[in-house]
């Protein structure tokens, strides 16, 4: 191990001492033990791996070794069809609380019913052992020492608390071979982590047990008897993953990658590469310039790159010796535990990077850069004064040239350089496209007789009828194909799946639509196609919520905080996202990308994206916030949506839409949405467009039978009003008692003129707060709140009676005011929050009011009382 410079050594020693002081302040045997391990480093003694692992075992005593997924078995349901449906419902609901992604896979992929075809376990292990054992020499030998580049010196600095907080892994991720879960590791005090990581930085390595991994295999497609269709995923210890994530972020910020490589960078690399390819094809056709493209596929790239090539790459990049030594140690004598179908076997890894480790991507692309730098500029395509000869996103590469000879020369160079670092082009899956101008017809034609060779193998030339895919976008030989996306199958599975209605909407927004979003944004789309998808989505959502067809469309598209469902309107959302992503690509992709994306094609695309939303009245909005504001304005401007105008006063009014509030039944969720949208079939509503239909109240009231009258004003619903009101008071009473108030319900306070009966009297710290609850109509929330507060506050004698009875000087009055649709008065909710009422209590009040309002409507229809005037 190389000796670091004195200045660097002083920095790490100072950081170790500071970390030890912070940990020592925690106190306890665990803190003292880790401080002692740090003192060993300060004394320049070798790393005591056993002591570090013993400390970790004491901190995480209940770890269980993961076993990996099992594909050959399906979930077995027993009994009648009804019992099987109940069992599947129980499974999905249980998964939904633990891992929403797993629940989504059960519903959308039906992996609980269909077993994946797999090869025999022995065949699987033997195949991947051979793949892992094919390497290009040890990572720790023949390291070419070089002085670090000045801009890379901070790469091996001591770890800070801020970096640790920002690098935390998701709690839902899997544990490594040590069994330490991300949830338990995230619960550990960051001061412990800082000292431990700085010990790693000081020694330039991690303990050998930590750098091990377990490898699970996931099918790339539906599976099959061939082990090659499975993708190995190496899961390291969460301790190593978090440390490597910090290093990866430092590396990306310090090193300037070749601008032709766009993966693992803080830019939209997929959009940049797809947009560049589309622009190049369009410019070649517009200017009738010859264009030849090679679409290259590599054979198991991440499993084949030589470890020695990784070390050479980081050394040439000017990384500090500490980083070079750390990477060399991490990839030296690597052992992984292969896990498949409940069986385990150890294997040595002599090539490849850890797939799943945050540092693997930056390391791989750094080695891949060597092949990009070997390309000759003579084989290139000129667009907007920019010479483009290649484009890459991780291992997905393209070579471009204006002549076949130039492309063939670069293809040879590229293949030779890749072979030196352990990578090989798959000639069977790689393709070529040749566009040649036809002078007589003034058009571009596809030529399939221009042969390109990779060593002795010929790359497949595409014809005019062939389709090919690049980064998820389907291309024809003339550019991106019009996106053919069908959501009908996924929506049908959501409908039939054992889900609550709110879960269906959540999966629609977080899984089904995002599944197709990238392709819709980056491919060509038509307004008709997007409208058809919007119609299909609306049809299913109305079915899930049992909403009539005349419910405002804005209710589905308005944001959740405004009282809507927050479902994106694809006709507007897709052009807007395309415009935003193109602009971001121009800003972050560098001058070369910006020049290419300023061509005529993208000028027209940007113009059409901006004018599309303008045509529906978005005030020339070019952000998602403007789109949300537009739909909110439409919603509250309609008869069935105007009552939601104040929904934004507090999040508890709409938080029943949140998937975290999983205790709401599906039936109640449907009723709440029917209330919010006036979708309950009252006489007044069903008479829309039927002028001769009677609309008077069936109870004989001299009123129109509106929803508001049925729930709030009819004689049939008076008993329900009292029960709903009492439920609100009970919730407030229980909450105030937990907050330390001495609470009393329905206190009788007599003045000279009147007997007052406030719902709650709260006493705490020499102060009394009088709270009265009311559930009112939707249109006058703030004025009704002021009237209620003024009713108590404007009687000076009442305050004196309270002071005398409770022996306090300070008396204040508050009102709990919300509408029968569960919408809060802004002043009311602010006053309740000042009393310490929690958001959860406010949410429970909202759902209690909504449920009470629904039961009031049910009561109205069940009661037969008639008033005779």
Curated annotation (Swiss-Prot):
Keywords: Endonuclease, Hydrolase, Nuclease, Nucleotidyltransferase, RNA-directed DNA polymerase, Transferase, Transposable element. GO terms for molecular function: endonuclease activity; RNA-directed DNA polymerase activity. Residues 601-869 are annotated as: Nucleic acid-binding endonuclease. Residues 199-475 form the Reverse transcriptase domain. The keyword Mitochondrion does not apply. It catalyses: DNA(n) + a 2'-deoxyribonucleoside 5'-triphosphate = DNA(n+1) + diphosphate. The keyword Hydrolase applies. PROSITE patterns: RT_POL (PS50878). InterPro entries: DNA/RNA_pol_sf (IPR043502), RT_dom (IPR000477). It comes from the Eukaryota. It is an enzyme of class 2 (transferase). Its EC number is 2.7.7.49. This is Retrovirus-related Pol polyprotein from type-1 retrotransposable element R2. It comes from Bradysia coprophila (Dark-winged fungus gnat).
């Amino acid at each position: 191990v190389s000796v670091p410079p004195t200045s660097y050594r002083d920095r790490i020693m100072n950081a170790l001492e500071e970390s030890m002081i912070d940990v020592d302040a925690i106190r306890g045997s665990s803190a003292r033990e880790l401080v002692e391990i740090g003192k060993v480093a300060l004394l320049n003694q070798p790393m005591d791996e056993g002591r570090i692992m013993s400390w970790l075992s004491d901190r995480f005593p209940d770890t269980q070794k993961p076993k990996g997924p099992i594909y050959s078995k399906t979930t077995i349901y027993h009994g009648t069809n009804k019992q099987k449906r109940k069992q599947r419902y129980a499974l999905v609901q249980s998964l939904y609380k633990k891992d929403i992604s797993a629940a989504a896979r059960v519903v959308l992929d039906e992996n609980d019913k269909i077993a994946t075809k797999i090869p025999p376990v022995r065949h699987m292990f033997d195949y991947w052992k051979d793949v892992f054992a094919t390497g290009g020499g040890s990572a720790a030998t023949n390291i070419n020492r070089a002085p670090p580049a000045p801009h890379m010196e901070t790469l091996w600095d001591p770890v800070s608390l801020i970096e640790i907080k920002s690098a935390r892994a998701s709690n839902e991720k899997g544990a490594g071979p040590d069994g330490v879960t991300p949830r338990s590791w995230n619960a550990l005090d960051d001061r412990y982590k800082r000292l431990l990581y700085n010990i790693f930085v000081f020694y330039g390595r991690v303990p050998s047990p930590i750098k091990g991994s377990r490898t699970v295999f996931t099918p790339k497609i539906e599976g099959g008897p061939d082990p090659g269709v499975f993708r190995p995923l190496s899961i390291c210890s969460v301790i190593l993953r978090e440390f490597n994530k910090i290093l990866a972020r430092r590396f990306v910020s310090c090193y300037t990658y070749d601008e032709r490589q766009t993966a693992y960078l803080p830019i939209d690399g997929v959009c940049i590469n797809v947009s560049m390819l589309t622009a190049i094809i369009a410019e070649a056709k517009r200017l009738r310039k010859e264009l030849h493209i090679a679409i290259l596929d590599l054979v198991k790239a991440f499993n084949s790159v030589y470890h020695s090539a990784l070390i050479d790459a980081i050394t040439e990049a000017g990384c500090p010796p500490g980083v070079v030594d750390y990477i060399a140690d991490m990839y030296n004598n690597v052992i992984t535990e292969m896990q498949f179908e409940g069986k385990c076997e150890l294997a040595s890894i002599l090539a490849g990077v850890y797939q799943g480790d945050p540092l693997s991507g930056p390391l791989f692309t750094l080695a891949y850069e060597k092949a990009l730098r070997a390309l000759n500029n003579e084989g290139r395509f000129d667009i907007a004064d920019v010479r483009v000869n290649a484009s890459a996103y991780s291992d997905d590469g393209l070579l471009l040239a204006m002549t076949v000879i130039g492309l063939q020369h670069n293809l040879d160079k590229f293949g030779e350089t890749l072979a030196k670092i352990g990578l090989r082009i798959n000639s069977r899956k790689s393709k070529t496209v040749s566009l040649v101008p036809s002078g007589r017809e003034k058009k571009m034609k596809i030529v399939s007789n221009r042969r390109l060779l990779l060593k002795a193998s010929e790359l497949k030339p595409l014809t005019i009828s062939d389709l090919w895919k690049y980064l998820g976008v389907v291309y024809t030989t003339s550019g991106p194909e019009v996106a053919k996306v069908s959501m009908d199958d996924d929506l049908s599975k959501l409908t039939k799946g054992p889900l609550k209605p709110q879960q269906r909407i959540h999966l629609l927004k977080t899984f089904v639509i995002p599944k197709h979003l990238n392709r819709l944004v980056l491919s060509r789309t038509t307004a008709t196609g997007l409208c058809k998808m919007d119609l299909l989505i609306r049809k299913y959502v109305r079915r899930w919520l049992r909403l009539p067809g005349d419910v405002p469309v804005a209710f589905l598209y308005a944001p959740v905080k405004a009282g809507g469902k927050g479902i994106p309107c694809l006709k507007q959302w897709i052009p807007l996202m395309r415009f935003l992503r193109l602009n971001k690509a121009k800003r972050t992709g560098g001058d070369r990308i910006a020049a290419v994306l300023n061509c005529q094609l993208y000028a027209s695309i940007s113009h059409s994206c901006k004018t599309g939303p303008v045509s529906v009245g978005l005030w020339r909005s070019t952000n998602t916030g403007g789109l949300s504001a537009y739909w909110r304005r439409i919603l509250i401007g309609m008869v069935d949506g105007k009552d939601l105008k104040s929904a934004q006063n507090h999040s508890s009014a709409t938080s029943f839409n949140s998937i975290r509030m999983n205790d709401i039944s599906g039936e109640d969720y449907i009723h709440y949405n029917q209330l919010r949208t006036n979708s309950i079939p009252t006489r007044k509503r069903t008479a829309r467009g039927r002028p001769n239909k009677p609309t008077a109240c069936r109870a004989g009231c001299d009123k129109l039978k509106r929803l508001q009258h049925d729930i709030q004003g009819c004689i049939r619903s008076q008993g329900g009003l009292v029960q709903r009101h009492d439920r609100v008071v009970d919730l407030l009473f229980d909450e105030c008692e937990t907050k330390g108030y001495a609470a009393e319900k329905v206190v009788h306070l007599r003045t000279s003129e009147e007997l007052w009966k406030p719902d709650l009297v709260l006493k705490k710290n020499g102060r009394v707060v009088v709270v009265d609850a009311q559930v009112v109509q939707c249109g006058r929330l703030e004025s009704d709140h002021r009237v209620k507060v003024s009713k108590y506050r404007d009687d000076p004698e009442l305050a004196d009676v309270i002071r005398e009875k409770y022996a306090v000087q300070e008396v204040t009055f508050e009102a709990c005011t919300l509408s029968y649709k569960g919408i809060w008065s802004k002043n009311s909710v602010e006053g309740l929050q000042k009393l310490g009422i929690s958001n959860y209590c406010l949410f429970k009040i909202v759902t209690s009011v909504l449920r009470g309002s629904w039961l009031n409507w049910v009561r109205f229809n069940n009661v037969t009382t008639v008033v005779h005037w």
